[in-house]
Amino acid sequence: MNQSYGRLVSRAAIAATAMASALLLIKIFAWWYTGSVSILAALVDSLVDIAASLTNLLVVRYSLQPADEEHTFGHGKAESLAALAQSMFISGSALFLFLTGIQHLVRPEPLQAAGVGVVVTLIALVSTLALVTFQRWVVRKTQSQAVRADMLHYQSDVMMNGAILVALGLSWYGWHRADALFALGIGIYILYSALRMGYEAVQSLLDRALPDEERQDIITIVTAWPGIRGAHDLRTRQSGPTRFIQIHLEMEDNLPLVQAHVIADQVEQAILRRFPGSDVIIHQDPSSVVPAAQQGFFER
């Protein structure tokens, strides 16, 4: 799984870096030629895109390193650390755009050669849509947190490029403050996206449980298995591509140890079929020794 995961995520990061680098050069020329603060916003965002995508590429390769003596659970948390760092950089760029927008709102300046800005923005819009489509496919295949964060950022770029088109069109017809107003809006949206990304990264670092639907899938597998009288203490978390799942199964007091082991092993394999590559730990308890306070999500 890790080889396929690493290959797909690396391709997504390389594609994002290449596209952002090409668009950066185009936007530098367009900003110099038009003086548009909205294009400046897009230019700064492309710089952030390059940094984020390069970081994702390096971090994914590091996070896929096998566990060692000092990191017995692997290196998957590196993805969350990278996402947290990216959110800080993106917040700084959003603040810069916001302040620049205020400056141009107070002292608006007419745009030069707005048509060039429209062409550049259209190129950026089409390119970003293609990248987001590819990233969405990779996320569906890998569930990578790094690519999902990158995809959300590029989705905001699609919205930003659409807003820039509107701003340039309005400025063309004399609404010179529209450019600054849209820059302010873009800055606010980027800040919101950065804070959301940072929140998700912190939750991952704090070992937030798997989503409700995934935990429910685990419960469904366990409750359907014959020979299990109950279950409790379901604990889950995720680190990079790996899910960690722990659960206690309650069985008949007189069940032979070998048979209890076979049942637990069958349940483990069923969970792994649903969540390939997971780290599953199952503890078997005699049902009579489980205190009522510990009885969990079902009892037969």
From Swiss-Prot:
Protein name, entry field: Cation-efflux pump FieF
InterPro entries membership: Cation_efflux, Cation_efflux_CTD, Cation_efflux_CTD_sf, Cation_efflux_FieF, Cation_efflux_TMD_sf, CDF_Transporter
Subunit structure: Homodimer.
UniProt main location, coarse: membrane
Classification of source organism: Bacteria, Pseudomonadati, Pseudomonadota, Gammaproteobacteria, Enterobacterales
GO biological process, one term: intracellular zinc ion homeostasis
Keywords: Cell inner membrane, Cell membrane, Ion transport, Iron, Iron transport, Membrane, Metal-binding, Transmembrane, Transmembrane helix, Transport, Zinc, Zinc transport
UniProt superkingdom: Bacteria
Binding positions for Zn(2+) per the UniProt entry: D45, D49, H153, D157
Gene Ontology MF term list: cadmium ion transmembrane transporter activity; ferrous iron transmembrane transporter activity; metal ion binding; zinc efflux antiporter activity
Function: Divalent metal cation transporter which exports Zn(2+), Cd(2+) and possibly Fe(2+). May be involved in zinc and iron detoxification by efflux.
SUPFAM superfamilies attached to this UniProt entry: Cation efflux protein cytoplasmic domain-like, Cation efflux protein transmembrane domain-like
Similarity comment: Belongs to the cation diffusion facilitator (CDF) transporter (TC 2.A.4) family. FieF subfamily.
Membrane topology recorded in Swiss-Prot or TrEMBL: Multi-pass membrane protein
Catalytic activity: Zn(2+)(in) + H(+)(out) = Zn(2+)(out) + H(+)(in); Cd(2+)(in) + H(+)(out) = Cd(2+)(out) + H(+)(in); Fe(2+)(in) + H(+)(out) = Fe(2+)(out) + H(+)(in)
Name of the gene: fieF
Subcellular location: Cell inner membrane
KW Lipid biosynthesis (keyword) present: no
Ranges annotated as spanning the membrane: 24-44, 82-102, 114-134, 156-176, 178-198
PANTHER family: CATION-EFFLUX PUMP FIEF, MITOCHONDRIAL METAL TRANSPORTER 1-RELATED
Matches recorded under NCBIfam families: CDF, PRK09509.1
GO CC, any one term: plasma membrane
